[in-house]
Amino acid sequence: MINRHTRQLPAAPALPRWRRALVVTVVLAAFGVVLVACGEPDPPPPPPETTTTTTTVAPATCGAPEGSGPTAVAVMGPCPRLDADQIAFWFGLNTQVPYNATVPLATLVRLFLEEGRAEGVRGDIAFAQSIVETGWFSFPGRVPASANNFSGFGATDGTADYGVFPDARTGVRAQIQHLRRYADATATACTVPPLHNPCVDPRFAYVTPRGKAPTWNQFGNGNWATDPTYASKVLAVYTNMLGIARLSLA
């Protein structure tokens, strides 16, 4: 029996062909956006090419020069056997007098090592020489600390003269250049070259013949000083310094 009260819903009208095409296009476009959003991320760009530059740095310390030994301690050498920290530490343990130099001890040690390295002179032994010359930088003699004269420059026996330098570096440089003239026969003139820094040594030309004392053992008796025990005094201080690093004299 047919239920007369049941009404049949009318069928949905078919979309026109152009509307169906539009719906498909919108769905596909939306699906495409989802695919792009959910796909694999682009790989990161490659890192930029870099160039590695290797800089050769001279060592802070090195062994004694070839041929240098207790009876022939070389004045010249590419680098010191003790570094600045070792020298300053040793000095603090051993000095018993006021320090009166115009710059702090750490600065003065650095100047000796820098200037020595520039001219190929062993700056740690030059520092030991200055200890002998200045009484551990207390300057008890006629050369005052304000002269920045760490090596008795110009303070010859029988005169009241002495060398005066404008600052500590200049005083150290003059000492190093004078040592090179004593030890190195190639130091023909107080110019650049053969020197590596501008000449500040007013007595450079007075050392003749050049290169006449290549070892510290030859100092004294007219080489730098008239004292016949000058070399032994300098080397005794240096031997003591080397003890901080358990090194022997060479």
Feature names for model-found ranges:
Residues T6-L9, T53-A58:
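Intrinsically disordered, low-complexity repeat segments enriched in small/polar residues
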Residues H5-L28:
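N-terminal export and membrane-targeting signals
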Residues A12-W18, P43-T50:
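Intrinsically disordered, low-complexity segments enriched in proline/serine/threonine
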Residues I2, V26-V27, G32, G39-E49, ...:
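Catalytic cores of secreted/periplasmic lytic hydrolases that degrade extracellular macromolecules
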